[in-house]
């Protein structure tokens, strides 16, 4: 099942008990965050606040608050099915020509999917049913959440920022938080390595001093939103990848004020520009780390037009100490990364980003070890292969007999298969998340790799221990007689 717009997905969630409508007047200032946080931590539904205090526009939160809802957005019921998305990405990142007729037939479905990539342009779009321009533009009229007591101002969180570089054929979609600065101004907090910032940098080099067109889409269809947070190849537009996931082309329309294309069924579109000479101090804000981050200077986005659907819905979220919505997205997208990594490193059995590690700061990888030093090779590969992992501070590598998603198993491997001096790899002066205040310099810090695998000859001079394993025949017999033993519980080991 695919969803053409956010509203059809809301209907689907509600029909399946995954969305709750709230008629009570809840304040976007702090109250929505507290309610959403409690519901998310209990594994509860998405929430639609139908009557936000002092506003008539409904607010949708916790849309992707469980891995199950992320899978549902892509027409799947089980998050493990998202590995199919990873397999598609692995194919796109490193396509191999067919080796013969049978191989060509096997790859035909993926080639057919590729035909759905180009977006479809439409002339009459729901997102442009209402047009607001000039002095009528007023961002303060939107029910923008003020998430935490120490936040400096309300914050736009789920906007898809659409940019295009002068050297790029594709448009880029990225999600960057935006501080409300005035009735027609937001601060665009994009870091230097992100797609939007790179497009802006290229534009400034070729067009010094000129205004840079930018569009932000709020409340797009769920597949396009998820495409914007998925590691698509640099040469591919997120619109194209959304078409692949959906099985039909993404509908877009031309913005009113510039040539950028926007998701046609979005709830709200903010159009405008960035003046390269206008910067503002952004923050502090509570972030996904569970702390307030430092302030810094970022470009100002001036909004010249607001277009929207009739009876538009404002899509929002909050970020805080895990679990939060980004952490739940990370748990689901974890399944996307597994096939991509396996394509490059077939020895990888599984890959896990613990949500309590802020989604990406720690990774645990299980491998089928084949030679001395193998664990270190996998560490280096994970840090360098996908830019999503260049901010991962800690990587733990374990053997295939260890469940990398089970902390009891992982801690057992660390404490029994590691020597701290021999098996710890420290690398200094590496890229680190700008929000990581634990690093000595902003954006630059160290990484640690832990080799918790069994050691091979050449890695140790000791006789290595053999794990204790019960005779499988005995286990089977005990399973058969368990109900006759009069023991209530039946643990499986």
From Swiss-Prot:
GO terms for cellular component: cytosol; plasma membrane. Gene3D superfamilies: Single helix bin, UbiD C-terminal domain-like. The active site is at residue 287. Binds 1 prenylated FMN per subunit. GO terms for biological process: ubiquinone biosynthetic process. The keyword Flavoprotein applies. Mn(2+) binds at residues 172, 238. It catalyses: a 4-hydroxy-3-(all-trans-polyprenyl)benzoate + H(+) = a 2-(all-trans-polyprenyl)phenol + CO2. Coiled coil: none annotated. Catalyzes the decarboxylation of 3-octaprenyl-4-hydroxy benzoate to 2-octaprenylphenol, an intermediate step in ubiquinone biosynthesis. Homohexamer. This is 3-octaprenyl-4-hydroxybenzoate carboxy-lyase.
């Amino acid at each position: 099942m695919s969803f053409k717009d956010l509203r059809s997905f809301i209907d689907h969630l509600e029909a399946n008990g995954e969305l709750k409508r709230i008629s009570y007047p809840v304040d976007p200032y702090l109250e929505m965050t507290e309610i959403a946080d409690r519901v998310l931590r209990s594994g509860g539904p998405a929430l639609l606040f139908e009557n936000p205090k002092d506003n008539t526009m409904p607010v949708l939160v916790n849309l992707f608050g469980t891995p199950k809802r992320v899978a549902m957005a892509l027409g799947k019921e089980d998050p493990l099915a998202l590995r199919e998305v990873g397999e598609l990405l692995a194919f796109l990142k490193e396509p191999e020509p067919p080796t013969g007729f049978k191989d060509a037939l096997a790859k035909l479905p993926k080639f057919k999917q590729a035909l759905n990539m180009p977006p479809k342009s439409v002339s009459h779009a729901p997102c442009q049913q209402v047009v607001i321009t000039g002095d009528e533009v007023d961002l303060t009229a939107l029910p923008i959440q003020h998430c935490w007591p120490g936040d400096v101002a309300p914050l736009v969180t789920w906007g898809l920022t659409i940019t295009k570089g002068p050297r790029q054929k594709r448009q880029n979609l990225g999600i960057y938080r935006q501080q409300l600065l005035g009735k027609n101004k937001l601060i665009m907090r994009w870091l230097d390595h992100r797609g939007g910032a790179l497009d802006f940098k290229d534009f400034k080099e070729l067009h010094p001093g000129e205004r840079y067109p930018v569009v932000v889409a709020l409340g797009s269809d769920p597949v396009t939103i998820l495409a914007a947070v998925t590691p698509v190849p640099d040469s591919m537009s997120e619109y194209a990848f959304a078409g692949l996931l959906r099985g039909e082309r993404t509908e877009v329309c031309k913005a009113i004020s510039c040539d950028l294309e926007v998701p046609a069924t979005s709830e709200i579109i903010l159009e405008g520009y960035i003046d390269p000479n206008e910067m503002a101090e952004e923050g502090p804000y509570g972030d996904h780390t569970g702390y307030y981050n430092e302030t810094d200077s970022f470009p100002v986005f001036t909004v010249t037009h607001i277009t929207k659907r009739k009876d538009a819905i404002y899509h929002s979220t909050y970020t805080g100490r895990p679990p939060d919505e980004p952490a739940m997205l990370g748990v689901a997208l974890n399944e996307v990364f597994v096939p991509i990594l396996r394509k490059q490193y077939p020895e990888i059995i599984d890959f896990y980003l613990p949500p309590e590690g802020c989604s990406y700061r720690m990774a645990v990888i299980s491998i089928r070890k084949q030679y001395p030093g193998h664990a270190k090779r996998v560490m280096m590969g994970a840090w360098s292969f996908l830019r999503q992992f260049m901010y991962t501070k800690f990587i733990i590598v374990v053997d295939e007999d260890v469940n990398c998603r089970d902390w009891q198993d992982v801690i057992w491997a660390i404490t029994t298969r590691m020597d701290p001096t021999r098996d710890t790899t420290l690398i200094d002066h590496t890229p680190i998340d700008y929000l990581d205040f634990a690093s000595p310099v902003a954006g630059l810090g160290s990484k640690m790799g832990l080799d918790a695998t069994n050691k091979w000859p050449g890695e140790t001079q000791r006789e290595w221990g053999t794990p204790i394993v019960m005779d499988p025949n005995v286990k089977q017999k005990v399973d058969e007689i368990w109900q006759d033993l009069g023991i209530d519980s039946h643990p499986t080991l």
